[in-house]
Amino acid sequence: MSMTTTRFAPSPTGYIHVGNLRTALMNYLIARKAGGTFILRIDDTDPERSKEEYVDAIKQDLDWLGLHWDRVERQSERLDRYAEAADKLRAMGRFYEAFETPTELDLKRKKQLNMGKPPVYDRAALALSEGEKEALRAERGNGVWRFKLDQERIEWTDGILGDISIDAASVSDPVLIRGDGQVLYTLASVVDDTDMGVTDVVRGSDHVTNTATQIQIMAALGFEHPRFAHHSLLTGPQGEALSKRLGTLALRDLREQGVQPMALLSLMARLGSSDPVELRSDMAELIEGFDVTRFGAAPTKFDVQDLFPLTGRYLQALPLEAVAKDVAAAGVPEDLAAPFWSMARENITTLNDLAGWWALCRDGAEPLIADEDRAFVTEAMALLPEGPLDADSWGAWTQAVKEATGRKGKGLFMPLRKAVTGMERGPEMATLLPLMQVIRARG
């Protein structure tokens, strides 16, 4: 095969989610590790459901994550190629028109299941005469076009699942063109993957049967099939199915919640593999450490909450320059940006938390004072050092309070922290105190 070429082929019928990302990321990393090509292919053959706003959103999500494509292809611009392939299959006797309604097909399936047989299309349409077909067209309109499978075993070595063998006799002849003329994914993908030189296809394990039929379609058209690898499907933390429509798992929603790209990518690049999840600092590290053969077939549990500790750890390592715009957007004056970030970085989960910490510094907090500590806090506030507060102020203040009240340890420090910040835990007080602009109002 030629240079490694992979593709991510979303349908622009909604926003992409973490399941889509897993597929996109694997294909991206394979291409980049091999020095190959990564194609973004928009599977927009369904004109009713495909929307340009979703195309834009897909590109925005991938760009946010740094999954930059080498070129974009659109299936809606390639309909002539699909028609050529369909004509070739017809000429070979591998394409036939079928007219059953959904209700009729459902009744056939139920009958087969009741008889203990697999629910496979019975190929009744192959027995129709030309006259019968004309009558059905007049009555029902154009039929669907099915690919006639060779009823033999279809075998390949999967990059994740290993050796696969599927009996084509247990699979229905796939519909490749609908009655309204719309070309379906199974045929369009075969033509595209060949024309675009795709060498490796990584997708979910729910596509295994689809892959088997596509291998036969490719062979019928004289195409060499690419290498296939089918990753496990994601489930929720309790093993429940994930829904594409579960909004909190859409990438755009994760972005709005403050999840950092490298936190998300670091998790998805290892989830379901035999390697532990490791937070990476950049894409180059992800590429270097990726190995598709390390992934397994078992369903993979995904918990969105795992993203937030990773995001926090990623942010802690960033210099001020990397977050200067975010710090400024939180309202922090430029001259306080450096000490503020030094304080906040250890105490945030996402950048969305910056505004809350600055509000504390700017406006103060509602004091948290136990009844038995009220007199102590009043006395302590009167001992606050004169002049601007700096890194030494906390030590000087607590020493003065200790000498005046006799308190020490937790009995000294905790009431002061709660009175100043309204919280039982948080940043080092020596770091936070110089940033507190209204603390003297408590005296």
From Swiss-Prot:
Database matches in HAMAP family: Glu_tRNA_synth_type1
PROSITE patterns on file: AA_TRNA_LIGASE_I
Statement: the UniProt record of this protein carries the keyword DNA-binding: no
Residues reported to bind ATP: 244
Main location: cytoplasm
InterPro entries: aa-tRNA-synth_I_codon-bd_sub2, aa-tRNA-synth_I_CS, aa_tRNA-synth_I_cd-bd_sf, Glu-tRNA-ligase_bac/mito, Glu/Gln-tRNA-synth, Glu/Gln-tRNA-synth_Ib_cat-dom, GluQ/Sye, GluRS_core
Gene behind this protein: gltX1
Subunit structure of this chain's protein: Monomer.
Family, as annotated: Belongs to the class-I aminoacyl-tRNA synthetase family. Glutamate--tRNA ligase type 1 subfamily.
Span of the annotated motif 'HIGH' region: 10-20
Pfam families with a match to the protein in the record: tRNA-synt_1c
E.C. numbers: 6.1.1.17
Motif segment ('KMSKS' region): 241-245
UniProt keyword annotations, A-Z: Aminoacyl-tRNA synthetase, ATP-binding, Cytoplasm, Ligase, Nucleotide-binding, Protein biosynthesis
GO molecular function: ATP binding; glutamate-tRNA ligase activity; tRNA binding; zinc ion binding
Domain of life according to the entry: Bacteria
Name used for this protein in its record: Glutamate--tRNA ligase 1
Function: Catalyzes the attachment of glutamate to tRNA(Glu) in a two-step reaction: glutamate is first activated by ATP to form Glu-AMP and then transferred to the acceptor end of tRNA(Glu).
Key word Cytoplasm present: yes
Localization per Swiss-Prot or TrEMBL: Cytoplasm
Principal EC category: ligase
Disulphide-bonded residues: none
GO biological process, one term: glutamyl-tRNA aminoacylation
